[in-house]
């Protein structure tokens, strides 16, 4: 059962999704710029739970070379840095709505010429279907209503090149709702799903392949 703060959190973002996609994007950018007024607001670089989630995410990937990688909702680039170390030959793009977060991400990796950070909104961003691997972690619940989740699923699927892999990581059992349009998408097939139930918060790592 969700806690009261989680319920209020979800209600807030569901209300935001009553706006147009563009209007919702403006509010989300302002919200996350405010949230990043102090560095690493979620303690992603030091929290044991977050580090466990990163390791678990990588453990579920199909073993293959990945040349072009995108992380949607990269925040300050903590997981992006891990990806750059794990795949030293890959071109990596980190995407977030908060320019303040991206400034810190660029400062974290100032010499990583093959890593770039881009301010963009997954609901409106247009990119070539060129990525071998796309990550979307702890992001979809900010989008609110089902029509926005459906739109995000379409957008995520379009990022993948032939044979590309999409990894979605979200709280369990909320992931069932958040991933439903990915599960049903005509251009995606679910490859694996693993649920981690250790405290403080269960989560699911769901891996999809481009058809």
Predicted regions and their residues:
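Conserved SAM/SAH-binding beta-strand->alpha-helix loop
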Residues: 98-100
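Conserved SAM-binding strand-loop segment of SAM-dependent methyltransferases
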Residues: 111-123
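Conserved class I S-adenosyl-L-methionine
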Residues: 2-61
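Conserved SAM-binding loop
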Residues: 105-106
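Conserved SAM-binding loop of SAM-dependent methyltransferases across substrates and taxa
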Residues: 76-87
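A short glycine-rich, Lys/Arg-flanked "PGG" loop and its adjoining helix->strand segment in the class I
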Residues: 150-162
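Conserved beta-strand signature within the Rossmann-like core of class I S-adenosyl-L-methionine
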Residues: 163-170
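A short acidic, Gly/Pro-enriched loop at the edge of an enzyme's catalytic core
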Residues: 126-134
């Amino acid at each position: 059962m969700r806690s009261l703060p989680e319920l209020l959190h979800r209600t807030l973002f569901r209300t935001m999704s009553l706006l147009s996609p563009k209007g919702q994007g403006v509010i989300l950018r302002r919200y996350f710029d405010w949230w990043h007024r102090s560095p690493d607001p979620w303690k992603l670089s030091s929290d044991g739970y977050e580090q466990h989630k990163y390791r678990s995410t990588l453990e579920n990937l199909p073993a293959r070379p990945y040349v072009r990688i995108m992380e949607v909702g990269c925040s300050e680039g903590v997981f992006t840095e891990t990806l750059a170390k794990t795949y030293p030959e890959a071109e990596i793009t980190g995407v977030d709505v908060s320019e303040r977060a991206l400034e810190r991400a660029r400062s974290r990796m100032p010499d990583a010429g093959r890593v770039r950070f881009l301010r963009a909104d997954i609901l409106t961003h247009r990119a070539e279907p060129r990525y071998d691997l796309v990550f979307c972690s702890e992001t979809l619940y900010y989008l609110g209503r089902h029509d926005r989740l459906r739109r995000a699923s379409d957008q995520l699927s379009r990022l993948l090149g032939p044979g590309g892999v999409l990894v979605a990581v979200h709280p369990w059992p909320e992931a069932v709702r958040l991933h439903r349009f990915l599960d049903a998408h005509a251009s995606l097939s679910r490859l694996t799903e693993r649920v981690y139930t250790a405290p403080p918060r269960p989560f699911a790592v769901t891996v999809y392949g481009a058809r």
